[in-house]
């Protein structure tokens, strides 16, 4: 999913699956400008030009001479009116930095998740302690009373490292709020509750800090995808 009407009309899609580099990519209604293949045979990087593409549902077709074709639906959404004019944060803001795992535990039921490796242990300073998005929501009145105009959370995308994941600077799924914090919908609720208070929400997302559990680290598109040395890599 992406949006039409963006100032930058170029878009790169990363397609990942077993042997996808062996396929050819076509589309009857999307303008494909380039298709890039790297060392791993499981990736296709498809470049699109969306300059004249309207909002709607589209389709990419992957074809192989000896295998069944694959149809991939893709949605372009319409941008909200005035979205390009949103004001960001600046030097006039009072920014409150929160490490969510260490702030407040609003929902003890999500402290651990069966699919996520690192478990809570309040006695271990290197382990998770149970703070979450609900804990932040529960304390918004307190934060507002301090005069805060913007909250900057350290990353909240899933970090499935087996230990030390509380700081969240090693994303394993950049599209999923870590389920020990809540859900994507709960993050939207946090944003909505802050908007009622005229407060801004800053999302911290570091694109070169990925977990060993991220699929692009487990299966590198190319050897030079990340810096690699004899030690500390």
Regions found by a protein language model. Give the residues of each.
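Extended acidic/polar, glycine-enriched regions
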Residues: 39-88
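Beta-strand/beta-sandwich contexts
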Residues: 1-21, 78
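A structural motif
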Residues: 13-15, 60, 98
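Surface-exposed loop and edge beta-strand positions of immunoglobulin-like domains
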Residues: 16-18, 49-51, 154
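Low-complexity, Pro/Ser/Thr- and charge-rich linker/hinge segments at domain boundaries
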Residues: 3, 76-97, 102, 106
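Substrate-binding/active-site clefts of carbohydrate-active enzymes
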Residues: 103-149, 153-233
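Short amphipathic beta-strand and strand-loop transition segments with alternating hydrophobic
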Residues: 3, 33-38
């Amino acid at each position: 999913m992406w949006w039409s009407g963006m100032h930058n009309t170029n878009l790169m899609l990363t397609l990942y699956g077993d042997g996808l580099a062996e396929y050819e990519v076509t589309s009857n209604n999307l303008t494909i400008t380039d298709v890039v293949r790297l060392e791993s045979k499981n990736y296709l990087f498809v470049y699109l030009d969306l300059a004249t593409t309207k909002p709607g549902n589209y389709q990419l077709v992957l074809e192989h001479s000896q295998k069944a074709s694959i149809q991939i639906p893709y949605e372009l959404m319409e941008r909200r009116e005035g979205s390009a004019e949103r004001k960001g944060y600046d030097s006039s803001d009072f920014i409150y930095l929160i490490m969510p795992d260490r702030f407040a535990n609003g929902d003890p039921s999500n402290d651990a998740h069966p699919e996520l490796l690192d478990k809570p242990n309040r006695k271990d300073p290197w382990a998770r302690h149970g703070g979450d998005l609900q804990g932040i929501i529960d304390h918004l009145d307190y934060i507002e009373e301090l005069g805060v105009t913007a909250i900057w959370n350290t990353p909240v995308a899933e970090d499935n490292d087996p230990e030390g994941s509380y700081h969240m600077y090693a994303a394993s799924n950049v599209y999923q709020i870590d389920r020990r914090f809540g859900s994507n919908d709960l993050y939207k609720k946090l944003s909505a509750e802050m908007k009622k208070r005229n407060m801004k929400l800053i999302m911290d997302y570091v694109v070169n800090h990925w977990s060993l559990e991220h699929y692009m680290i487990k299966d590198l598109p190319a050897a030079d995808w990340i810096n690699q040395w004899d030690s500390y890599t």
